[in-house]
A protein has these predicted regions:
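N-terminal hydrophobic/helix-forming segments and targeting peptides
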Residues: 1-201
Length: 201
């Protein structure tokens, strides 16, 4: 807010900061605010949690990953499981299975469906991978949802640097952090129809 002239959000939740809102020529710089995730789809009587994908999450990397289930009572830790290796390889005629959405599940430590529900977990709860940030060799960094977080940081930095360096633009600049990118660019599409930019990056 301190770096733009005005702000607004749309009904989807996309956040917009505008510099020079009265100028007719409109430029959008956009990042996205959402991240890949999973949804709780089914809870068995034994407390095993099955999921559906939300966005472009890769199920092949899921086995043994730690996750956070965002439930009604807060965050619950869990871990991805899938059939143990000795059960996957017990049939000599059959090739070892690959991870599939259908054979992946979450274990949150609960022993029954009631125990899962008592933790605040319900069908529709969002599941994200555990937080984590690290530095690799040669100044490379890794972390959860880095694509959108770095993108959001970059567009905010543009606004900050323009303000702090007292740069005047001959056009309206819309700094847009859109939602629903991971499920089909919906937020960007809706806000573009509202702003009607001449240029979008």
């Amino acid at each position: 807010k301190p770096y733009v002239d005005t702000t607004f959000t749309d009904p989807y939740g996309t956040a917009v900061g505008v510099i020079n809102p009265t100028e007719k020529f409109k430029v959008v710089i956009e990042a996205h605010a959402d991240e890949i995730s999973w949804f709780v789809n089914y809870i068995t009587n034994e407390g095993v949690i099955y999921l559906k994908r939300n966005g472009g999450v890769d199920h092949q990397i899921a086995p043994a990953k730690r996750v956070l289930i965002h439930g009604k009572k807060g965050v619950v830790k869990a871990v991805f499981g899938w059939p143990a290796i000795h059960t996957r390889m017990s049939n000599g005629d059959q090739k070892e299975q690959n991870p599939k959405v259908e054979n992946l599940f979450l274990d949150c430590g609960a022993r029954t469906k009631k125990e899962v529900e008592a933790l605040g977990i319900h069908v529709g709860s969002v599941v994200t991978y555990e937080e984590g940030f690290d530095e690799l060799a040669h100044d490379y960094y890794i972390g959860r949802a880095f694509d959108n977080r770095i993108g959001g940081y970059m567009i905010a930095e543009v606004a900050r640097l323009l303000k702090e360096n007292n740069k005047k633009l001959p056009y309206a600049l819309y700094v847009v952090n859109a939602v629903q990118e991971e499920i089909g660019l919906r937020g960007a599409e809706m806000i573009a129809r509202r702003i009607k930019p001449d240029i979008a990056i």
